[in-house]
From Swiss-Prot:
Keyword match Transmembrane helix: yes
Domain of life of the source: Bacteria
Positions contributing to Zn(2+) 2 binding: 123, 126, 153, 156, 185
Parts of the chain that traverse the membrane: 4-24, 74-94, 112-132, 143-163, 176-196, 198-218, 234-254
Keywords associated with the record: Cell inner membrane, Cell membrane, Membrane, Metal-binding, Transmembrane, Transmembrane helix, Zinc
Protein name: Zinc transporter GufA
Record-linked InterPro entries: ZIP (IPR003689)
Binding of Zn(2+) 1, residues: 126, 152, 156
GO cellular component: plasma membrane
Species in which this protein is naturally found: Myxococcus xanthus
Principal subcellular localisation of the protein: membrane
GO-annotated molecular function: metal ion binding; zinc ion transmembrane transporter activity
Length: 254
């Protein structure tokens, strides 16, 4: 339990580390932001596949299920994770650079606060993934997930801080709020750890749930954001490299 929480805290802190350059610059071209966000999403997509869904399938088989029975259990976990994020997305007020205000209420809230709330939608499932993966029998699984998420949190922190600067926040406030978005990850990890404390048999469900939640965020939020400004090719190149990074981490540590 402790290892997962500490790892998620360190991974979340990487967001603040990535935000530090905002103290000396307030601009990053959209062309550069495309591959940056694409890299993050590629790593998420790879991590969702290699470190969450595939281990969930192996664990379900280890519990004596096979064929359609195993597939249905993992599929149900993935769909439940996506549904959880969809409901949260529809209820919580937040704001995106591309799509503007979304969620229920909060239309008069400060735009910086709404943007921070939007990032909690991204970071909660990442923390959940770290917490759940550290409960797996293979200790290297949790390390792979935490390192991958921590690595992609660094450029994400810069993108978040620059967006906050563009909305009018001071450099120090932008860096602090970017760090704050990363602190949602230990909350997600705690959520996963507490759920799994009920029964170890829930582990494959937890891995699949975290994978589904991340998949929802990748498709619904981050890929559209990375394609804004007409730099789809650069964003897709970044996504491919991020996916390869996740593959290398998983195979090197596994």
């Amino acid at each position: 339990m402790g290892a997962g929480l500490v790892a998620s805290l360190l991974a979340g802190t990487a967001t603040g580390l990535g935000a530090l350059p905002v103290l000396v610059t307030s601009e990053l071209s959209r062309k550069a932001q495309g591959p940056d966000v694409g890299l993050q999403r590629g790593r998420d997509a790879g991590g969702q596949s290699f470190s969450l869904v595939i281990p969930a399938m192996e664990l379900v088989r280890g519990q004596g299920h096979d064929g359609p029975s195993a597939a249905l259990r993992v599929a149900a976990g993935v769909l439940l994770g996506g549904l959880f994020l969809r409901v949260w997305h529809d209820l919580m007020p937040h704001e995106h650079a591309l799509k503007g205000h979304e969620g229920h209420g909060g239309t008069k809230w400060n735009s910086a606060l709404l943007f921070v709330l939007a990032m909690t939608l991204h970071n909660f499932p990442e923390g959940l993934a770290v917490g759940v993966s550290f409960a797996a029998p293979q200790p290297e699984l949790g390390l792979s997930v935490a390192l991958g998420i921590g690595a992609q949190n660094i450029p994400e922190g810069l993108v978040v801080a620059l967006a906050l600067r563009a909305s009018g926040a001071s450099a120090s406030r932008a860096a602090f709020l970017a760090l704050l978005t990363g602190m949602v990850e230990p909350v997600g990890a705690l959520f996963g750890v507490l759920a799994l404390s009920l029964s170890s048999a829930l582990l494959p469900w937890g891995l699949a749930f975290a994978g589904g939640a991340m998949l929802y965020v990748i498709s619904h939020e981050m890929i559209p954001e990375s394609h804004r400004g007409g730099f789809e090719r650069e964003a897709t190149t970044g996504l491919m490299w991020g996916f390869v990074l996740a593959l290398v981490l998983d195979m090197s540590l596994g």
